[in-house]
UniProtKB/Swiss-Prot annotation:
Taxonomic lineage of the native organism: Bacteria, Bacillati, Cyanobacteriota, Cyanophyceae, Synechococcales
Swiss-Prot/TrEMBL GO biological process terms: circadian rhythm; detection of redox state
The species this protein was found in: Synechococcus elongatus (strain ATCC 33912 / PCC 7942 / FACHB-805) (Anacystis nidulans R2)
Phenotype of null mutants: Grows slightly more slowly than wild-type, decreased phycocyanin content, does not modify photoperiods in response to increasing light intensity, shortens the photoperiod by 1 hour. 20% reduction in the level of CikA, CikA is slightly less sensitive to DBMIB, CikA levels do not decrease in high light as they do in wild-type. KaiA levels are higher than usual under all light regimes.
Cofactor(s), by name: [4Fe-4S] cluster
Keyword terms, alphabetized: 4Fe-4S, Biological rhythms, Iron, Iron-sulfur, Metal-binding
Name the record gives this protein: Light dependent period A
Length: 352
């Protein structure tokens, strides 16, 4: 496998990106997620723009290289040009919680980030499901913004390959300011992803950004963030991203169109049904990115190892189960477009 395989996957229409979460910083899980999805055939791993997170993801990808002798997927970090749902964490004062509270917040949290002592910040990725469910309204969201100019030099030295900019309609000024900050480092990047949530004016807004970006970046990925952070809720969450991508393919600016925000195991079938995949149409969806739908099915396998600070590859049976689960999500896109479907690596099938 060549070092350019992620770009080839984009161009061919079978790109798969694992989203670890722009605010998610549970380091042992991130390491093992990166290893698992690399083995399953992912082309890119997207993580928070924090050095410790990047190091953890790279440790998982280094384990992949050792185990397979193959080049690793790209590593991408997420930035924001202003307030954004992906860049927030829940917070509450546990001393204000009544002792007899049924604690519905704990039940709805997909990462078990909420305990009797409050929110574990490294586990919270800002999905917001706890915010409306607190009986006393004690939970609030704390937003934050990545200091791109301060962090990017170190992250590039560590070995990131790409960045993703989260933006939204009405952020032209904020995007332009961030874009100017990024100029010195753009030549070092393999790709730039621009993520925007669905909105009636989204395509016109992205055309405005295209004029600003121009030809300064060779590989641009437009991420159609249909229903942010919802892919693990149910099958129907994929529809918004599919509709947005369909509109982008016919009306949007040039570049690779990649779905996110509600993507799940049903996304590929819907894209096939609408003939949006290669080679069914001349301009096709370049790929999909999955967050909750990719992480949640692996939680029961990876969390116990994280608590014990154990590497996944030291437990072959768990690794095989994790990779099998991941292939079930990655494989359909690769198969549908004729990409190289990853089978269970031979070393995982060896019996002791």
């Amino acid at each position: 496998m060549s070092a350019s395989f992620p770009l080839e996957a984009l161009q061919a229409g079978h790109w798969f990106k694992l989203i670890c979460g722009a605010s998610y910083q549970h380091l042992p899980v991130i390491r093992n997620l990166a290893l698992t999805y690399a083995l399953a055939g992912a082309d890119c791993v997207d993580v928070a723009a924090e050095p410790a997170v990047v190091r953890s993801a790279l440790a998982g990808l280094a384990a992949y290289e050792r185990l397979t002798g193959r080049d690793r997927p790209w590593l991408m970090v997420s930035l924001n040009d202003g307030e954004d749902l992906h860049f927030r964490r829940a917070w509450f004062d546990p001393d204000r919680c009544p002792t007899d509270c049924p604690r519905p917040c704990e039940r709805v949290c997909p990462t078990d980030a909420i305990t009797s002592t409050g929110v574990q910040r490294d586990r919270c990725y800002g999905c917001g499901r706890c915010l409306p469910i607190c009986p006393l309204g004690l939970i609030e969201a704390q937003a934050w913004q990545v200091d791109a100019a301060a962090l990017l030099p170190e992250l590039l030295d560590l070995g990131i390959n790409a960045i993703e900019i989260h933006t939204q309609v009405g952020h032209q000024k904020e995007f332009q300011q961030l874009w100017q900050q990024l100029q010195p480092w753009l030549p070092q990047l393999q790709a730039i992803a621009i993520s925007c949530p669905a909105h009636p004016e989204a395509i016109a807004y992205l055309w405005d950004l295209q004029e600003l970006v121009g030809n300064t970046v060779e590989t641009v990925i437009w991420q159609t963030d249909g229903r942010p952070m919802s892919g693990d809720i149910g099958a129907g969450t994929t529809h918004a991203a599919v509709r947005f991508a369909q509109a982008m393919l016919t009306e949007g600016p040039p570049g690779h169109v990649q779905l996110a925000g509600g993507t799940n195991a049903h996304t590929v079938a819907k894209l096939q049904e609408l003939k949006l995949l290669a080679p069914q149409v001349s301009r096709f969806v370049a790929g999909i990115a999955c967050g909750g739908a990719a992480r949640t099915p692996l939680a029961e396998l990876l969390e116990p190892l994280a608590e014990q600070q154990r590497s996944l590859e030291a437990h072959p049976e768990v690794l095989q189960a994790a990779v099998t689960t991941a292939i079930a999500l990655v494989g359909p896109l690769k198969q549908a477009v004729g990409g190289a479907t990853r089978s269970i690596p031979a070393f995982l099938l060896r019996t002791p």
